[in-house]
Each structure stands twice: as C-alpha cells, then as structure tokens.
Amino acid sequence: MKFFIDTANLDEIRAAESLGVLDGVTTNPSLIAKIVEDPASFTRKDFMDHIKRICEIVDGPVNAEVTTLDAASMVREGEELAAIHNNVVVKCPLTIDGLKAIRSLSEKGIRTNATLVFSPNQALLAAKAGAGYVSPFVGRLDDISTDGMALVGQIVEIYDNYGLMTEVIVASIRHPQHVVESALIGADIATIPYSVIRQLANHPLTDAGLKKFMEDAAVIKK
C-alpha cells in the first residue's frame, strides 16, 4: 500500500519525505487555507506556486483540487493545474459536473481524483467516468456513526469484481487504526496527516525496550 501525506504544509511534507516512506501528497482548499498567513493577499498565482513547490519536494503524485463547481470551469482550472508539473493530479468533487469534468480531463490525458466520495455508487461512477483515483472519506463517515472502512471494503470489492483500474485513496484518516484497516482491506493508498504518520512509528513496548537497552549499554566501553 502506498502512503500519501494529507497536508499542504511544506515542512510536514519535507519531514515525511525524509523518512523514506512517502509516495505522494494530497491537498484540498481547507489544507491550503491552514498554511496561508494573510488570506487577503493570497492570490491564484501564490496557490499555483505552492503546488509547484510541493512537486519539487516529492517525486510522486501531488493532488490539487479545483475550486469551481461547473464542469467547464473545472476543466479549465484542471488544465491550469496539470500544466504546473507532470505529477499533478486534479481533484474534482463527485458531483454531476465533477463527473463531466473528470471525463473531459481524462480524455485529455490529465490524471484525476474523484474526491468527497461517500457511497459505493459514487465510487462506481468515478471509475466509469475515467478517474485515476477515488477518495472515500472514512473519518467524516465515522463522525456521523457510519462505518467508513466498510465503504472502502465495498469499493475495493466492486473494483476487483470488474477489473476497474481506478486506485482507492483512503482519505479523512484520523488515527493509525484507519491505516491498518486500509492495508488489510487492500486499498491502494492511504493519505495520512503528518501527526498520524508519526504515530505509526510509536509503540510503548518499543520505548520501554529502548530504555532498557540503553541502560544496559552502559556496560559497553565507549
């Protein structure tokens, strides 16, 4: 399973990249907003430049989301994003217009990610429209007392049934168990906040064992 980092923070991306486990990046307007110090002066060019900087850090897919709602505007914006770097993947929301944009962009050879997916029906439509990736949001489903990981399992099964090549990106990950369950289900990718990536490496028995080893290492002459 591939690991993407779900952030627009350059320091977090660099830190994750230094671990040697990073395969790509996902961003969205909310994540971009978190890193903007002065929203009043942040321009479209600033946004495009930021995506370019991410592409310079990570040698893998960098997902950037459109900020328009009608199909024609999404296509136009998607073409602009794709022109930034060969690694850019254009995220489009799973709406009727989003499906039209995904189809059009895919026909132009531009990779797409159908985002804000919350049902198997939406995921099937995304694959049929030509999306390279589909992003079910598990945490947001959990928030409304629905089993988000069950949706991932359904999508993986449906895609396997018909040999659909759309890759499943498990999104809205909240904790390490989401990552484990994604791997067990057979999802292609988990996109993970940096805080959760760090949690994946932690275990109290590792800490206890290391403490004991270091105490015992005192007998080794320096």
From Swiss-Prot:
Subcellular location: Cytoplasm
InterPro entries with a match to the protein in the record: Aldolase_TIM, TAL/FSA, Transaldolase_3B, Transaldolase_3B/F6P_aldolase, Transaldolase_AS, TSA/FSA_arc/bac
CDD domains: Transaldolase_FSA
Residues annotated as catalytic: 91
Coiled coil: none
Superkingdom of this protein's organism: Bacteria
Pathway: Carbohydrate degradation; pentose phosphate pathway; D-glyceraldehyde 3-phosphate and beta-D-fructose 6-phosphate from D-ribose 5-phosphate and D-xylulose 5-phosphate (non-oxidative stage): step 2/3
Record's keyword terms, sorted: Cytoplasm, Pentose shunt, Schiff base, Transferase
GO CC, alphabetical: cytoplasm
A single GO BP: pentose-phosphate shunt
Recorded catalytic activity of this chain's protein: D-sedoheptulose 7-phosphate + D-glyceraldehyde 3-phosphate = D-erythrose 4-phosphate + beta-D-fructose 6-phosphate
UniProt EC number: 2.2.1.2
Gene Ontology terms, MF aspect: aldehyde-lyase activity; transaldolase activity
Pfam families hit by this protein: TAL_FSA
The protein's enzyme class: transferase
UniProt record similarity statement: Belongs to the transaldolase family. Type 3B subfamily.
Task of the protein: Transaldolase is important for the balance of metabolites in the pentose-phosphate pathway.
Name this protein carries in UniProt: Probable transaldolase
Organism whose genome encodes this protein: Chlorobium luteolum (strain DSM 273 / BCRC 81028 / 2530) (Pelodictyon luteolum)
Gene this protein is translated from: tal
